[in-house]
UniProtKB/Swiss-Prot annotation:
Belongs to the WD repeat EIPR1 family. It is found in: Golgi apparatus, trans-Golgi network. It comes from the Eukaryota. Disulfide bonds: none annotated. The gene is eipr1. It comes from Xenopus laevis (African clawed frog). This is EARP-interacting protein homolog. Pfam families: Beta-prop_EIPR1, WD40.
């Protein structure tokens, strides 16, 4: 059973920002943001044609500055938020804004291969998330499962919740919390939990991971020294409400039960350099992607701590079949965790990995040299999970 070859797309600029187009569940579409100091930065809207194994793209100009992070609205596929650098009074500031893809490109019309970025259209600015009073933005993330009207941003040591009003053309700061402690504490990343009616978020600062209840804007747990060095990324298990994955500069990926934070449930040590990105599969949470500056992407099968640790358990209607074939009885032993694959198509640091929002068996990875690689879960494993 031969697996499909990876599909590679090259951007002309360096890049580290990648997201799936969350609200798009039919087309396989990713958004990539560039980092260039000399030229106008761009958002590449990447459509993957699964049947023909080819990539189509649109290029949109992002005049505001080099893009450090990008997040797609969960409700409107044409709306996105970016964190970007700009120079103001000879100082570099990291800001955030909400943008709309121009109407002409919303229907999935694509450039011909001869088109260049010189005639590319620009993103339409909807509103700024003005954090001037709070410092530099570290990240921005949308409320999951929401109507696209709520955003979380982290700026220096502030956790900020924004409401978008008037068709997303106005942002209002609805609540905030402050990270307090010794020294200059700064948030590095954050994630909004899809569980508990979206009332909890997790943040990382230095080596610690903290949980917050956004109703009271108070801290509800703190994992001190979660990693030996800086925590780079977080992700919530979509199917197990207390489970959280983290990765960091200690080259490790850790899995936590936030009800018992004294030690991780599981630790992976497969990367040889900083781990920048960790992502659970949205449908099959045993599938976990990680990307690292060792230039590798690793796909792990963390089935023992997944929502289906025994695989598919037997339904009552299957019992009669099993009596005829007792040797086919499904095992009740927990399945073993394993590394499914190590993907080495990149030659530079892999800063982002993302699952497709339309196809649960397809994922993309982005390295700093502007190389986007699209891969698939091996067919044998796919059928093993499904059957």
């Amino acid at each position: 059973m031969e697996d499909d070859a990876p599909v590679i797309y090259g951007l002309e600029f360096q890049a580290r920002a990648l997201t799936a187009q969350t609200a798009e569940t039919d087309a396989i579409r990713f958004l990539v943001g560039t980092q260039s100091l000399r030229y106008d930065n761009q958002i590449h809207v990447i459509d993957f044609d699964d049947e023909n194994n080819i990539i189509n793209k649109n290029v949109l100009l992002h005049h505001a500055g080099e893009i450090w992070q990008i997040g797609a609205s969960p409700a409107d596929r044409n709306v996105l938020a970016t964190c970007y650098n700009k120079i103001s009074d000879s100082k570099v500031m990291t800001c955030a804004a909400v943008w709309r893809i121009p109407k002409e490109l919303q229907g999935g019309n694509h450039e011909s291969p001869d088109d260049t970025s010189s005639n590319a259209q620009s993103l339409e600015l909807l509103c700024h998330l003005d954090s001037t009073a709070h410092g530099n933005m570290a990240c921005v993330t949308w409320e999951p499962l929401g109507d696209g009207k709520k955003l979380l941003s982290l700026a220096d040591n502030y956790l900020l919740i924004w409401d978008l009003q008037e068709s997303s053309t106005k942002s209002v700061l609805s609540s905030s919390a402050t990270l307090e402690g010794k020294g200059q504490l700064r948030f590095t990343s954050g994630k909004w939990s899809p569980h508990h009616n979206c009332t909890q978020v997790a943040t990382a600062n230095d080596t610690a991971i903290r949980g917050w209840d956004i109703r009271s804007m108070r801290q509800i747990y703190c994992i001190e020294n979660a990693h030996g060095q800086l925590v780079r990324d977080l992700d919530f298990n979509p199917n197990k409400q207390y489970y959280l994955a983290s990765c960091g500069d200690d080259c490790k990926v850790k899995f936590w039960d936030t009800r018992n934070i004294h030690e991780p449930v599981k630790t992976l040590e497969e990367h040889s350099h900083w781990v920048w990105s960790v992502r659970y599969n949205h449908s099959h949470d045993q599938l976990v992607l990680t990307g690292s500056s060792d230039s590798r992407v690793i796909l792990s099968n963390m089935v023992s701590i997944s929502s289906e640790p025994f695989g598919h358990l037997v339904d009552d209607e299957d019992l009669s079949d099993q009596e005829d074939n007792p040797q086919e009885e499904k095992t009740k032993e927990p399945l073993q965790d394993s590394i499914i694959g190590t993907y080495e198509e990149h030659e530079d640091s892999v800063y982002a990995v993302e699952w497709s929002s339309a196809d649960p068996w397809l994922f993309a990875s982005l390295s700093y040299d502007g190389r986007l690689v699209i891969n698939r879960v091996p067919r044998a494993l796919k059928y093993n999970i499904l059957l």
